[in-house]
Amino acid sequence: MARFAPDATYLSYRDVTPEALTAAGIHALILDIDNTLASYEQAEPDEAVRAWLGALTEAGVRVGFLSNNHGERVTLFNKTLGLPVLFDAHKPLLKNARRMMAALNATPSETAFLGDQIFTDIWTAHRVGARGFLVPPIKDKTDLFTRFKRRLEKGILRRYYKKNPDAPDVRPERRQKGASV
């Protein structure tokens, strides 16, 4: 199950700081968009996302988007940012993850993936030899397939928190009940 366990959890993308990344030897960050940086309904990045991405790039962290969503949505989100982007990525397949690392001129050991799903973002990161950082979903998506995946994720996260009790708890049911993190 280690291939599915995140290397770190954060309560928000904003908690992933340029200082922490560079201190950990991470010089490239591959980002999911939907439910990681913005809700599915949010067409463009808000000011907080823009400021965070600006701080990362200013610190020398190379950033790109790897999304399973379609081209129109991803292109519109990236329009004002101008970052490297690959859409219809078919995560957890490796082809486009490797293409994005090549676009960022990054090796697996200096790369991290940031996303809200274990079976796409975290597993993809580990399959290419990079680190995987997990954030809670911005909005619960209620389609049947996503609900099924979230149920499977619960068991993985339960084991993760037994081994990492001080890690920020990204489980929606814990955050809603006001657990201290």
Where does each model-flagged region fall?
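Asp-based, Mg2+/Mn2+-dependent phosphohydrolase catalytic module
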Residues: 1-31, 38, 42-43, 48-113, ...
